[in-house]
């Protein structure tokens, strides 16, 4: 949870424009990687319905894979749905859904390339049966985007207390200063919850605001 908090605090901050040695403002170059940090923008995912797939109650919205995420929801008859996402790094990430029809964002953290998205329905106890597998080809607008958007594991919006704290900590700071400020805050104020780490159950979803309370 501490690492998720650092992610949210650093990614949701805002700061002033950097200056060069001559004191002039640094201009963004269209050919360089865009500076996505410290502009006060909250990166919230959307299910626009422009590119969709649906199989047996499993809904995928693939409208924004270039932004480093896709949306998924479940309205089927099983008690649980498991979606596994595996990219070119061959690391499978698993996400659990209730049959409530609510969309959640799933990040595409392995960069450009093909991702295998496999949906499994719970058929009893810890047993799951395959519903379908889809190959999703991804070309990111920028490699940092999968780590900036709110998603199922790092869930935040404009009303999240962590976002408000991030803006407060990083106001007027350069990018490097903002990272340092967040780092100092976390090591001084947040304690790793060893008991929770040892007893957490499958399907647990972190809450970044709850992490703020673990002092």
Residue spans of the language-model regions?
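N-terminal accessory/pre-domain segments preceding catalytic cores
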Residues: 13-176
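Active-site neighborhood of thiol-dependent amide/isopeptide-bond enzymes
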Residues: 175, 185-215
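C-terminal motif of bacterial Sec signal peptides marking the signal peptidase cleavage site
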Residues: 8-11
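Conserved hydrophobic/aromatic pocket- or pore-lining residues that grip, position, or stack substrates
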Residues: 182
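Sec-dependent signal peptide recognition
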Residues: 1-4
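Short, well-ordered surface patches within globular domains
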Residues: 179
